[in-house]
């Protein structure tokens, strides 16, 4: 009898399991399916129940789950992947720019730029209150600051506030009307600390020339007309549609407590500094939020542990909102690398200025801040572009790891210059490299605005994806949209080839496509703190997936770049399909 009871119990359990698994409401068969599960990366078929993955396997294994009520889709060999995840996207800012005047990093003559400004003034795309603003400006323009002044401080523009915003969103140029509105003049500049003076371009006589970077740009951004709540909700809806069309079903917003026009680089948050969080809440309440958003709160780089209480009061205002999580904080360790901004923090000085950029964090206390966040179970996501900023960011995380092994995954984003001594530190510190590898290109940015100004060693290890990977680092995909396109397939192809208009940017740092497929799925899910729910097609995880128009494992890099999404599914429901496919 003792042997009979276990046998009966096991049969009952098996029968119950079959019953539970027999209620698939959606089955997709005959596919080329990438699961992003390292234990079982490729399968033929997928079963979905109540918005979650029920099972994956062969056609034969999954067909037994089909009932009369089950919707069955024959993929006919098409490729299916998990929904893609962007580990660094300012999506609502991007949504605003979709409907606004934008140069898209294109360079044209000042005559043509002025012509476009007139056109955007007439159609309203450049108008924000009484200010004319154009986004997406190439950093190559900033060497012409004085020519901009001659053009846009007189004639028809003499009384019109104008701002040209860099595609990097760290730099801008403002005319005299706008500078006056922001209170920026020679007198102000002379009262600023030396580091902050360097964030405002100056003429020989000490007057501002209109060029702004980081904290200098904050001063002008703070007096720009604010977008209305309705405008922001429309921007969020546009961003959601656009991301879904690219196969993106989750992203991490790294500055969710800062709204457009609010200072970011010198942010001193209060419990009322809620940024775009109310917009995400409103979007969720419409029932149409077809993406997971992990919203980070920007902490001032010089914050102390007690300051986290203020951010926690913000977090508590936005709990239990479907598809919105608040997993941690974002910190700026430095600025940007390109000439003339050069605010990224370097180990060796810039060749022209002999300065080392601006390290925004305080190395003596940064570890205390990271450790305090880690103790709360918060992930820390750090903007670090220069090699010194990367080193000090790792040092801060190292302090947290010495204090405890929390299991919280922290990340460093951008990683434009990384000293080789840092490569082997990422894995043992459990730090993910959140990289915008679309930027790994031999172009005017890397060759004209960076190479002449940094050491040969620093330049050699620019966006060093392969070197990091070789030392065991985990890479997550990221775009920094609207700084550049959020299209993951563009970034995947670029990470492989590193080809640009001026050649190849250190071909040795190229990585393979499968690494990039994991970077935009399970690795990115870890980065944003949602790896238990999304990122791979495994039983119990949410059924977020995409179907694409080609076999991304076999096509060449050009074809990979041009991949189109045929449909995007969120929680087992189709949320995007082009008009015809």
Regions found by a protein language model. Name each.
Residues 81-87, 413-414, 434, 476-479:
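Active-site neighborhood of phospho(di)ester-bond hydrolases with catalytic His/Asp-centered motifs
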Residues 283-287, 314-324, 426-428:
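Acidic (Asp/Glu)-rich catalytic clusters
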Residues 300-304, 413-422:
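Short, conserved secondary-structure transition motifs
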Residues 371-381, 385-410, 420, 424, ...:
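His/Asp/Glu-enriched, well-ordered alpha-helical/loop segment
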């Amino acid at each position: 009898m003792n042997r009979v009871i276990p046998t009966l119990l096991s049969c009952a359990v098996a029968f119950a399991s079959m019953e539970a698994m027999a209620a698939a409401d959606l089955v997709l068969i005959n596919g080329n399916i990438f699961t992003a599960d390292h234990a079982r990366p490729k399968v033929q078929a997928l079963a979905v129940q109540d918005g979650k993955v029920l099972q994956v396997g062969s056609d034969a294994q999954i067909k037994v789950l089909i009932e009369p009520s089950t919707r069955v889709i024959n993929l006919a060999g098409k490729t299916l992947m998990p929904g893609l995840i962007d580990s660094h996207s300012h999506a609502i800012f991007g949504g605003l720019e979709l409907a606004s005047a934008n140069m898209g990093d294109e360079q044209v003559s000042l005559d043509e730029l002025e012509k476009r400004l007139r056109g955007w003034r007439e159609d309203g795309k450049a108008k924000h209150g009484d200010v004319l603003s154009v986004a997406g400006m190439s950093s190559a323009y900033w060497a012409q600051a004085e020519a901009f002044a001659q053009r846009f401080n007189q004639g028809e523009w003499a009384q019109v506030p104008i701002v040209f915003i860099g595609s990097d969103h760290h730099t801008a140029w403002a005319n005299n009307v706008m500078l006056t509105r922001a209170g920026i003049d020679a007198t102000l500049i002379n009262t600023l600390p030396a580091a902050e003076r360097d964030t405002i371009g100056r003429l020989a006589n000490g007057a501002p020339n209109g060029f702004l970077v980081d904290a200098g740009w904050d001063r002008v951004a703070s007096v720009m007309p604010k977008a209305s709540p309705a405008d922001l909700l429309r921007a969020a809806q546009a961003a959601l549609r656009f991301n879904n069309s690219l196969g993106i079903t989750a992203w991490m917003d790294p500055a969710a407590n800062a709204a457009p026009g609010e200072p970011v680089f010198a942010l001193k948050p209060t419990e009322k500094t809620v940024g775009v969080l109310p917009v995400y809440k409103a979007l969720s309440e419409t029932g149409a939020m077809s993406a997971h958003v992990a919203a980070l709160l920007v902490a001032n780089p010089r914050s102390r542990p007690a300051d986290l209480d203020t951010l926690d009061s913000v977090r508590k205002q936005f709990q239990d909102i479907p598809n919105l999580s608040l997993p941690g904080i974002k910190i700026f360790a430095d600025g940007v690398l390109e000439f003339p901004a050069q605010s990224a923090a370097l180990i060796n000085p810039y060749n022209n200025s002999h300065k080392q950029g601006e390290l925004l964090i305080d190395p003596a206390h940064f570890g205390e801040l990271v450790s305090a966040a880690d103790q709360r179970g918060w992930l820390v996501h750090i903007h670090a572009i220069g090699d010194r900023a990367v080193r000090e960011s790792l040092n801060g995380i190292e302090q947290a790891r010495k204090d405890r092994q929390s299991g919280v995954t922290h990340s460093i984003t951008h990683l434009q210059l990384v000293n080789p001594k840092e490569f082997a530190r990422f894995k043992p510190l459990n730090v993910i490299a959140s990289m915008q590898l679309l930027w790994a290109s031999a172009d005017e940015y890397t060759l004209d605005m960076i190479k002449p100004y940094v050491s040969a060693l620093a330049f050699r290890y620019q966006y060093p994806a392969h070197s990091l990977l070789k030392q065991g680092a985990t890479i997550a995909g990221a775009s920094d949209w609207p700084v550049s396109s959020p299209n993951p397939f563009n970034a995947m192809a670029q990470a492989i080839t590193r080809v640009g208009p001026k050649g190849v940017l250190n071909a040795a740092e190229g990585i393979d496509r499968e690494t990039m497929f994991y970077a935009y799925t399970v690795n990115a899910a870890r980065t944003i703190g949602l790896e238990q729910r999304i990122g791979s097609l495994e039983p119990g995880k949410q059924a977020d997936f995409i179907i694409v128009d080609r076999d991304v494992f076999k096509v060449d890099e050009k074809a990979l770049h041009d991949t189109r999404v045929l449909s995007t599914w969120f929680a087992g429901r189709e949320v995007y399909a082009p008009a015809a496919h």
